[in-house]
């Protein structure tokens, strides 16, 4: 079984989270571990991926959007999405050379991880043709946007546990106009987010065939003031 590390944090500002990813990326690139899974939440923030769609997917004046949350253009695939408290953001920094050099398979396994997680709560979730992510009916509960460099992945997934979904009303999330978003809470499941994180780690381990040892930020030589 592959050997990896998991880093569990609390609410971390978006750009600090990016720096943590880059530190983890370097550790994986050096071969010190097969992969690092970072789990955290962000303060309210909108991010726009390389697919763009800046103008048509923001439904309010830009100044109004920026009053609600920060806004960043980022390196991941996809268009605009929202991150905020109550949403688990998982950044799997994995060396695909240790699995298969297949990005589509990696995304499929990310989806499978969340589908299996939701099964634990009696929620039937699945995929939707032409779209990435995990869906419950016609509503997306987990968005996926990754980047890959030298076959090492970064960025990742955003899974709605008890997120304030009103923030999604200001955008066409992921550029999708015909379908909505949902959360575990909206589906009637009120679970402590830390317990959901634990189950998520188990499902990552199961689907990707990797054993995780928990680490701290000190292991990545990051000076951080995150609320762990």
From Swiss-Prot:
Catalytic activities: octanoyl-[ACP] + L-lysyl-[protein] = N(6)-octanoyl-L-lysyl-[protein] + holo-[ACP] + H(+)
- Enzyme Commission code: 2.3.1.181
Q: Where is the signal peptide?
A: none
Q: Where is the BPL/LPL catalytic domain?
A: 31-212
InterPro entries for the chain = aa-tRNA-synth_II/BPL/LPL, BPL_LPL_catalytic, Octanoyltransferase, Octanoyltransferase_CS
Q: A single GO BP annotation from the record?
A: protein modification process
A single GO CC term, please? cytoplasm
Q: Report the locations given in the UniProt record.
A: Cytoplasm
Q: Which residues bind substrate?
A: 76-83, 143-145, 156-158
Recorded GO molecular functions are: lipoyl(octanoyl) transferase activity
Q: Which residues are listed under the site Lowers pKa of active site Cys?
A: 140
Q: Which UniProt keywords apply?
A: Acyltransferase, Cytoplasm, Transferase
Q: Which SUPFAM superfamilies match?
A: Class II aaRS and biotin synthetases
Note the PANTHER family from the entry.
Answer: LIPOYLTRANSFERASE 2, MITOCHONDRIAL-RELATED, OCTANOYLTRANSFERASE
Q: What does this protein do?
A: Catalyzes the transfer of endogenously produced octanoic acid from octanoyl-acyl-carrier-protein onto the lipoyl domains of lipoate-dependent enzymes. Lipoyl-ACP can also act as a substrate although octanoyl-ACP is likely to be the physiological substrate.
The identity of this protein, by name, is: Octanoyltransferase
Source organism per entry reads Thermoanaerobacter pseudethanolicus (strain ATCC 33223 / 39E)
Q: What are the top taxonomic ranks of the organism? A: Bacteria, Bacillati, Bacillota, Clostridia, Thermoanaerobacterales
